[in-house]
Amino acid sequence: MLKPRYSVDLIKQMAECDANYIRLLKLVPQLAVYRDMTLSNSVKSDKGSTSTNGHLKRVPHRQIESLVGLKVEFAISEALESKGPITVQIKILENFRYTNTLEIVQKPEIKKLLTNPSMIVRIYHDASSAEVISTQGHKVSQSRYLVKNPKMYSADEKMRVNAFLGEWLTHCLKVGRSIRTPEKLFTI
């Protein structure tokens, strides 16, 4: 009996990418500036500076540019062989009006056991979605690959790497703790 051909479940794939967007906003709250800018551009009032409900304000472009290079790091496990704690680092590589590109890597390198995960993730603020565009240096661009392909990707490679990103970010949210102490705990 022939095995049924893999078909892309677009609803499930988009739901995973949308959930990853929410997880990333929780881990890197500075990204909300881009989301707010996207919302303020789409819901302008007559004045052009606030939305009709008065909550969203136009974000100055110079404030957005300052986030490129921002690194957020979370310890997800205790020290391993005196190399320090295992951490996940999220770095903003580039930004445009409606998108950001992030690099997410796990440190330190543990080459004798396994290859540390690393991903390039594109965030689409206008669609409230985040998807993996590269993992371990390999571009993941197709929603479905042929069963026999030169790079030996699975048929649902894109879905699998986005699901792994979701599990990785969820782990950071559950057990991760920030490496850097916040500058302000609260304002009065």
Please provide the spans of the model-predicted regions:
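N-terminal "first-domain core" detector
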Residues: 1-83
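Glycine-rich, often proline-containing surface loops adjacent to acidic residues and nearby aromatics
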Residues: 3, 7, 100-102, 144-147
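Conserved aromatic-histidine-acidic binding/catalytic patches
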Residues: 8-12, 16, 109, 152-160
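Aromatic- and glycine-enriched beta-alpha-beta binding-site module
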Residues: 86-135, 139-141
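Helix-rich interaction surfaces within compact, conserved domain-sized segments
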Residues: 135-188
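Preference for intrinsically disordered or flexible, low-complexity segments
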Residues: 1, 5, 10-17, 21, ...
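Generic structural hydrophobic/aromatic packing signal, biased to beta-strands
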Residues: 21-24, 28, 72, 88-92, ...
